[in-house]
């Protein structure tokens, strides 16, 4: 029983820690207080929400804590870019 409780606790804590590393959208005023660390791009999204999710995922993978979407275009599938910040 103790092993099960330990495993459940470890799973719960690991789930919570993933949220800490997620990149969040930032406003222009918030971005002024952050360091720009690059730009990410994504394509092939069918909705704006899906495009934002792809850009957020790439920003997090690059170690960013925030991102600001700078472009979105539609040519059958959506593509876009975002500046990433730390």
Curated annotation (Swiss-Prot):
GO biological process: DNA damage response; response to stress
Range of residues in the leader sequence: 1-22
Annotated keywords: Periplasm, Signal
Source taxon at top rank: Bacteria
Entry annotated with the keyword Signal: yes
Family the UniProt entry places it in: Belongs to the BhsA/McbA family.
Lipid biosynthesis recorded as keyword: no
Name of the protein in its database record: Uncharacterized protein YbiJ
Main location: periplasm
Compartments where located: Periplasm
One annotated Gene Ontology cellular component of this protein: periplasmic space
Xref: Pfam families: YdgH_BhsA-like
């Amino acid at each position: 029983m103790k092993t099960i409780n330990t495993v459940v606790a470890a799973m719960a804590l690991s789930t919570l820690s993933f949220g800490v590393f997620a990149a969040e959208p930032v406003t222009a005023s918030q971005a002024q207080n952050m360091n720009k660390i690059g730009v990410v791009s994504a394509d092939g999204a069918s909705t704006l929400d899906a495009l934002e999710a792809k850009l957020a995922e790439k920003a997090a993978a690059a170690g960013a804590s925030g991102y600001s979407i700078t472009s979105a275009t539609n040519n059958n599938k959506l593509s876009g870019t975002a500046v990433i910040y730390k």
